[in-house]
Amino acid sequence: MAIRTLDDLAAANRAIGVRVDINSPLTAAGGLADDARLRAHVDTLAELLAADARVAVLAHQGRPGGDEFARLERHADRLDALLDAPVSYCDATFSTGARDAVADLAPGEAVVLENTRFYSEEYMAFAPERAADTALVDGLAPALDAYVNDAFAAAHRSQPSLVGFPEVLPSYAGRVMEAELDALSGVADTPTPRTYVVGGAKVPDSVEVAAHALSHGLADNVLVTGVVANVFLAATGVDLGRASTDFIHERDYGTEIARAADLLAAHNDALHLPVDVAVERDGARCELSTDALPPAGDEAVCDIGSDTVDAYADVLADSETVVVNGPAGVFEDDLFADGTRGVFDAASEVEHSIVGGGDTAAAIRRFDITGFDHVSTGGGAAINLLTDADLPAVAALR
């Protein structure tokens, strides 16, 4: 069954529950440190409000016990500033207070309901039919006429707010969800040569992306960066030194070294590994050829080197499509930002360009790189879609 979108929804004067992902970094004082995720959902919310819908926003923020576990009042205030429509806040999610807040909305008004993760059900994975019986869905659904899921970044999860409402309400994909599915599901239809850039510190995810792309003929080239590159270098027998080797084994990435070796044996011509790396020496960036490794003492490999950036830029210049997943180094540190900035700058010049979410999107914002066709809002969800893994929240919409 095809997923319905906002094009199929008659929204006027109807109460629409909209699940978004506005989980954002907070300042020490509890304010919003970055509103990128809120901005991502503005088009969906604005379209519904312009159509005179009465919008109830559902979202989560942080985890219990964490510094960023907070009420959504500040999120409501920010959405009120971003949208050309009134947005209020309700400190309830599915109780009588929440239902009354929805009932009191005039057409073209929105209310942000309280953090769904204040309730234990949102920490449990449910089959959709079981999710429909939870207190959250059972309590709030009677106040709603329809449900819109725009939370692609949470689509790999199966909590009640994501998979329960489609069991009991007409349900639709929002504009963020629609754009993400179109972009990330359509990689096989993009022009070739097609190059994947994999990096970051989430090694199993990136290795899986590379393996899937290579085994399914999606990638003509895979440029390996970040901690992922360290794992691949280790698979070729390169001694990374004590610090980087310990980092790999402390995270139980030893099995990924074996998997990298298998990929190199099967797809050596398509895989591109760094020829030089960067470490910190006497407070400065020091670049070393991979032939000159291991580095001295406790020096850790924290970035790819400039020769690698140049080599990867040449591959990207000959590519028609690029899929980027993961930064090339510790880009938050100016000493080790060059690799990520250089590779991402080159990738942004490719005719067709798709970027995974999470740290990749954060790096793009940090370096103010423009030109990418699609920058995903999702980390784990983007990985699942790029590897054909399950997305329960998407399946629930079908």
Swiss-Prot record:
Entry's Gene Ontology BP terms: gluconeogenesis; glycolytic process
The entry marks the following residues as binding ATP, namely E332, G357, G358, D359, T360
Return the Pfam families for the record.
PGK (PF00162)
* Catalytic activity field: (2R)-3-phosphoglycerate + ATP = (2R)-3-phospho-glyceroyl phosphate + ADP
Sections of the chain in a coiled coil = none
In terms of SUPFAM superfamilies, this protein maps to: Phosphoglycerate kinase
What Gene Ontology molecular-function terms does this entry list? ADP binding; ATP binding; phosphoglycerate kinase activity
Name the keywords, alphabetized: ATP-binding, Cytoplasm, Glycolysis, Kinase, Nucleotide-binding, Transferase
Provide the E.C. number(s) assigned to this enzyme. Answer: 2.7.2.3
What is stated as this protein's family in its record? Belongs to the phosphoglycerate kinase family.
For this entry, the protein name equals: Phosphoglycerate kinase
The organism of origin for this protein: Halobacterium salinarum (strain ATCC 700922 / JCM 11081 / NRC-1) (Halobacterium halobium)
Primary gene name: pgk
